[in-house]
UniProtKB/Swiss-Prot annotation:
Serine protease inhibitor. Inhibits trypsin, elastase and plasmin. Does not inhibit kallikrein. Residues 1-25 form the BPTI/Kunitz inhibitor domain. The record marks 21-22 as: Reactive bond. This is Kunitz-type serine protease inhibitor RsTIS5. GO terms for molecular function: serine-type endopeptidase inhibitor activity. Keywords: Disulfide bond, Protease inhibitor, Serine protease inhibitor. The lineage of its organism: Eukaryota, Metazoa, Ecdysozoa, Arthropoda, Chelicerata.
């Protein structure tokens, strides 16, 4: 987590775990 990753629409869903958690608003 050194730098913020671009928003990933594929991760636009409620996830409690995984890298997608950083993408959900």
């Amino acid at each position: 987590e050194a730098e913020p990753k671009p928003f990933n629409p594929v991760c636009y869903e409620p996830k409690e775990v995984g890298p997608c958690k950083a993408y959900v608003p």
